[in-house]
Swiss-Prot record:
The keyword Glycoprotein does not apply. Residues 40-56, 344-355, 717-733 have a biased composition (Basic and acidic residues). Catalyzes the first step of the methylation pathway of phosphatidylcholine biosynthesis, the SAM-dependent methylation of phosphatidylethanolamine (PE) to phosphatidylmonomethylethanolamine (PMME). The keyword Lipid metabolism applies. One of its GO terms (cellular component) is endoplasmic reticulum membrane. It holds the Pfam family PEMT. This is Phosphatidylethanolamine N-methyltransferase. Its EC number is 2.1.1.17. Residues 108-114, 222-228, 304-305, 420-423, 496-500, 588-980 are cytoplasmic. It is found in: Endoplasmic reticulum membrane. Residues 1-64, 339-360, 705-733 are annotated as: Disordered.
Amino acid sequence: MSGPASSTGFHIHAEGLHGRNVQPSKPTSDGGVAPTALGEKSRVEEDERTDSEKKTFGRTPDGTIFTVPPTRDMVSQLLSPSEPKNLSDIFVLAIISCHIFLLRFLPSSSSRVAAFAIIFLFWRAAYNIGIGWLLHMQSNGRTLVCWAKKSNIFVNPSTGQNPHPILYNLLKWELETKIPEQYSFEDAPTEYNTWLVFRRVVDLILMCDFTSYCLFAIACGGRPAGEGFIMLALRWIAGMSLVLFNLWVKLDAHRVVKDFAWYWGDFFYLIDQDLTFDGVFEMAPHPMYSVGYAGYYGISLMAASYKLLFISILAHAAQFAFLVLVENPHIEKTYNAPPPRKRVAVDTDNVKPQDDDVSQDSSVINDNVYSGQAVATLEPSSMHNLLGPHNIDLYRITDSSVLLIQILFSALAILTPSTPVYQFFFVLNAALWRVWYSVGIGYILNRQSHCKMWTRHFVKYGESNQEAWQQWKGTYHLSMTMTYASFIAATWKMYSFPQDWGYGLVLLRHILGASLIALQIWTSASIYESLGEFGWFFGDFFFDQSPKLTYSGIYRYLNNPERVLGLAGVWGAVLITSTKSVIFLALLSHTLTIAFIQLVERPHMQKLYGQSLRRDAGLVRSLKRSLPPSLKQFHGSVDKILDDSIEFIEEFIEAARPKLAAGVKTFVKDTSALFQKYPARITISRLEPDLAGYDQKDYSISLEGTQSSEPAQFERASGKEGEKARSMPDRRGDKKNLMFEYGAPIKVKWTAPLNHSKKDWIGLYMVTDNTSREITRISSQGRWIGTNKASFDSLTCEQGLISSDIVINKFREDGEPKDVASGEMVFSGDKLWWTQGVFEFRYHHNGKHSVMAVSRPFEIRIGRFDDDAIYGDRYGLVRAAIESALLPVVQNCFDRDPEIAPQTVEEQYGSLVDRNGKYSRRVVFAVHQMFGIEFAPEVVRADGNVRNLAWRICNAKKVLAPYSMSRTNGATTPTAEHEG
């Protein structure tokens, strides 16, 4: 895992906006040598440096640097009598007081519960949906800053440009009262002032959210009937402990991240300081949203209310959705931008053509190391993962076998009766599979680590290391799924449906059990995200790579997350069933898992990585720092006892020769869904009343683009038509059909009257999507550009705009010359359609859907690769032709971005191709249309360059030659020569 990085765009680990610790960057000395004695002048210079180090400098997107003044936290500003109060503070306190009075004056307990449930859900929706939408729009289009600039609310009224002088003076007084030091309302950038106003809105929502939750807890609170004093005391002690822990998490998090990250400051501007992780951020991922909500469950425990518990779970889930949909995409875009591509000069004269008879399994290309010679001589590796529902492939024997066995297990568990005999056999079956998964798999890995037993077996029969690896993955995957399928079947057999959900702790046990199962699923997904397919299947037991150990993802906090969290679902099943048999299976699973880690994984890791293995993870380090000296000494003694015990067990097992091993793994379930969707524009579809003032003859649209290849233009005459239609049609006039390359940028030139609306816009549509030429009745889905800058509330609509309102003299269709406004824009990337078809551009009036002009229809077509154009059947000629045809298509699919699009067939793709799947999906669609071969998107990412992809296409065409669409390859269908 990479270390802390600068906030200006270097790679760091995404931990959530509330997970960024900001520490000042220390300026370096010019001379590099400290003086031995300081005079008066030196002391003055040092004091000045110290003062400058205390200042924080911000940087806006346009490069403006400013001093970020110190601010105080929300609670102190509102509740501390020593802090100055302004109108916004009084307003927030008044709203909070209304909540408290409402609780006091509502007549009945049921009305208080219902009212405050609705009020809390309203404020929670305002937080997660309202603030989330504002931040999403600000992140993608800088919408809030655009609103501020369009309204001119931060412009001094003395300039005559601010139509709201009262609002200006109010905001000036409000903000300068709150920030008395190092702040000037007039001099601060618009981004910073916008953030300060946004903070006041956030203060209102957060305070009301917290207050309404506490009042809802008071309304729901009570003591269960028949509860003893001991249970009451335990419930309150546990609840208070969780609340105090929650309070410590919030305070420590605010100490670490300060107000800048607490209020999502980097959605507006960045600060020139280092970002590090400290305190609570070493304990858990996203602590503000994970352990930072422990207080919800503590309050629910003290209130003894299931209503409060269910709403707490709902609010917590909404907060995770906010993290996944809003914060994580922004952090990935802002801080984890792909690094610049390393360009390597390739000597093409020394590259030898590759023999097509070389086995694909003979070598594997390292995705992170690039060499021109290696790319030319090594074949690309396969990319066909096993884990995850999206990777299920029923053509693969492993997947089909696993699916059939799962169906069999489910049928046996459901259709057989739950008698003691069947229960015994299901529990025995689960125990045997667990023993095999631990002892059997552990023995294989141990022998593989010591003497490459598994690999040697396949080499003995002439197979490669890659074949051994693929077979091992299938064996391990089958064993893992069978282990958990048998455990689930045994749990199902031992489970009895509750007759009364309200009796005792039945409902609570089910809630806690389901939570533990969800925790194990999340842990497994996090482990897979950190390790990948290679690490999940213990790839370092099979491949000798240069040892490089990194701790990322969940491994930043825990050394072996599968030891505890990876088995949480097993103990969740124990809580749900409450049977001795499931407790036995859980104990067996946990014991064998620990033995597997200590006896198989740990020795291999020590042998492979040696001293680079860390002793303590982030969570352990944080806990050790919090322990008093006496407990630290006790912890050291316990560690020594555990180490001695483990050493004794290892010696005993080594003498007995059985090898116990287990690793608890589970299916991966991806809970992240990042939606980056540009806002569709206006949906109102009525004629504007002021259209009569505009002459539609003054509006026009003309297009320029890269013409498609000749094969695409001549494919209309393919021999399938009637005899008269097999030749190209005669055209009268000088205009030819517009047919552009797939993915190539299209330049749009427009004209409009001099008084046209500044909110006019041009959208791209399929011709068949609109039946009317006067009104557009379908959204553009982000494929639109405004004709003028600063006319809409998002910067997204300005991407591609080149020029606007350039006055030219134009001859209209009726021959009359007239001065009109003109402009140019380029549609590229996400503003294009990534499919084949016939399209048109539409010019719309005043931000509405009234159509003023429509462009000529144009076609996007991918020409099929013509094998007949290559003379002979030499592999080198075919491959070179494929490379030549493929390179411009791949460049278009990668938006012609020099950071990711290759300039030569040997050059590696940029790293953004691996992060964003849309690029590889564009390429596989184009390959399918050009060559009739369908690849998975993972293949494009695995190949890494055009040369490897061309080799794969050649190989696929060779394998599928009898079924080729070309007339020269086989005669499975009648050709023209055979037709009678």
